[in-house]
Amino acid sequence: MASPLQIRDHLQESYADVYTAEALAALTALAPLDVRRRERMAERLARRRERAAARRPLAFLDPDTLIPGTTIRVGEARAGEFDGSEIPPDLERQWIQGTGPATKPHAPVATGLRNVAYALLSGADGWMFDGEDALGQIATMSLDNLRNLRLAIAGDPLFLTVAEQVAAEMNAWAEGFFGRPIIADWRRQLDFTTRIFRCRGLHLDDRHLRHGDGSGFSASIADLCLYVVNNQAALRAAGRSVVLYLPKIQTAGEAALWNELLSALESHLGLPDGTIKAYVLVEQLEACFQLMEIRAALGRHFVGYNTGRWDYINSVADACAWDPGFVNPNIDAITMTYGYMRIYEDRVRRAVNTPDRNGRCALWQGGMETNIPVGTEAGVQAGMARAVAGAEREQRAGASGKWVAHWKMVHIVRPVWERVGEANQLGRVFPPLTYTPAAAADLTLLEPAPRTVRGARDLISVALQYGNAFAQGQQAAALKPADFFLDDDVLYLMEDMA
């Protein structure tokens, strides 16, 4: 039997609306699975050390082996011999998903709720409220984030008051930028956007919870229980799905552990298996070697993949750190059409469009648009043209939609999918995935591109700026290299922990 949980600094009293009796019961029920989480993380580090010592690149799995934590063989997963999920109605059209936290550092509740109001009034088809990379991990921000989401999802009067004020401010900005308002009826607009939550990754411990013996407690389990338990009834009563984003998954074995956590929580709450839906961010090179296996391991919970950029570039560099011949070019040269990034995106779209045994495919949500329309007129025009061109490329490539890092970008990028009018990419046909040595080598394909001192300066400059923001709890910050501080034609980009 699991030890009782410890909650630090009397937070159970001050956050009684987050640490509810129901949520604490779920945390206690899932706590025994934290042992398996620690085992998976130890295996992750051991694999990395072993590969580096042997100077061995990543490879595809043996098709005859079982996916750890499942009864599914690798070859069966690749052939679609598993039961996937139907796409629920409120996820069938996700042309634009916004991202960002539901609070601010050291903010009163009403101030933090402004973040939620901007998100739900933005016109985005979905909004991923972030408990991970974009959320500061100082003080009680993780709990403030969850409190604000509960207030918004429940339609608390304080949230509605804030939303009315924010709607007026958003329309004032839109009148100046577009020449028209973007919100006709703010109450009705609040109902448009699908609510999505991103938990923290399996590698992290929570800062407020401990096991009874004083050892660290999984941040993933904490986020999963505190969000789902406190909000699932209100979401389902409103006809909404319970939707998560799962970050930093590296292997199908880790995905199987997530599946076990989701199923255990559903069982604890008396919900049918597969009630909780999950997107997976493909942020790790190793995961790109196991895309069908991860889909299969998550089974009826899995609805789609998202193709990120910054985390994935970093993971490629990390996986190849043992190889002195692997040197990335300047970061601005590593676009989604560059070498290994192009291969990565192509494998993701092939994986989601491989049907399961019931003929069901999954969704591909395109990558992040980090531009924000703040700067000189010429700079904004150029930045928005790049943003629209990038969205058009992803739509043609088969993405069901993409991410934006700021609410102001929703009405700039969403028309790309509106003009086409297709709800999603389901039904498009792409070549089947291959698992040859050449396909493996392509996942670290370098192509000619600049490697310059300026590129190094840019990275160092942005890292210093981000470190300063991070220390203040601003894990999502508008940044640009210092060499361009005086050039307003060069726009700031929204960046988070990636």
Spell out what each predicted region is.
Residues S3-L33, R40, A52, R56-F82, ...:
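Conserved alpha/beta-domain cores
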Residues R49:
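Catalytic domains of riboflavin
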